[in-house]
């Protein structure tokens, strides 16, 4: 059934009239450019295409192992949890809830879905589309509420598993409240390393700009910390980053309102960073002008602050530098080849290991064979790590895993592996039908 529903829904989202409707609806509630909002619709449509026909059935493929006597065999099954809950954030009003909701349904669960109330109209409309495509209305419960009400519902209803996508603070509270019966895709302070091989300067500058400032930096995968190898110091990379950032404007929402930080709080953070010895403002650091954005939201120009590497790793500075600002903001630093162990130490100390990028086509750098301790990929744990000249931190499509690593509570999204990990558990059933040997007798007690 769900293969058929997916096929019909994928077809609907492929229609220009429907995709434009959802793109515009996303823009109404989430400050994104048209192209960024359309990206959500596109990924969602492709995800649904991936699970048409028998692909849903294949998700639940089991296996059998012969036993140790005639008539015995064990069967391993992917088993649904049953009653589950899904809580999703404001920054991807369509993509995250649809991919997680459908994953839960594909594996046979009964979900209650809560989307951030600021943007929940998008998913309300999508549910109506799914109902029109054959989704039984009783298969999904959809709730609009504040966080406190949802927390009470979770504690009283006691779902067997809850998927939470959102802030680390709320994630840790829920993990305690729900006694660990939770999967998390929470905050990411995501880093990018530019390796020693300098090439394709314009392309790499553009990707850095997209990673840091698309959707006004309000992605859990947004580039938060950029490490630039000293070989790039002779290039115009920083000036190109500045030029790209300055062409973003409120009129087309290539920069826009920040929904979880005020302008004052973001600028206060910038000023604190500028008190660190050797730090400097590379660009931005000013409020947007000529707008009517309410003061409860943030509105600043795309901003980058340089902080020396040796200052970043100092205990008194590290927590400040690695504070996630969910807005158009990033830290930039540089490093020498001999300082790579310091860079790796800084990465290891981070608590959120979501996305990362190692921008280099130098295989010795990617695997870091300088010394055992100098490993880049081998000494990091980010669940979605891009490596190579075109490496990025954002823009994950539907065709590869997206999620953190290094935490047993970590959730993935989009792929068969992610769906099976998050929305099912392993159950083993051992069939032992005999026959009992003809000469069997009751043995001595043991």
Report each predicted region and the residues it spans:
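Flexible loop/turn segments at secondary-structure boundaries
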Residues: 92-94, 119-120, 149-151, 170-171, ...
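Hydrophobic alpha-helical scaffolding
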Residues: 34, 74, 116, 143, ...
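Conserved C-terminal structural/oligomerization subdomain of aldehyde/semialdehyde dehydrogenase
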Residues: 1-7, 115, 135-137, 238, ...
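Rossmann-like NAD(P) dinucleotide-binding subdomain of oxidoreductase/dehydrogenase enzymes
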Residues: 27, 58-204
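ALDH superfamily catalytic-core signature
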Residues: 132-134, 157, 169-316, 338-341, ...
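N-terminal Rossmann-like NAD(P)+-binding subdomain of aldehyde/semialdehyde dehydrogenases
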Residues: 1-73, 116
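Hydrophobic packing residues within well-ordered alpha-helices of enzyme cores
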Residues: 48, 123-126, 153, 174, ...
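Short, solvent-exposed loop/turn segments at the edges of secondary structure
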Residues: 79, 99, 137, 177, ...
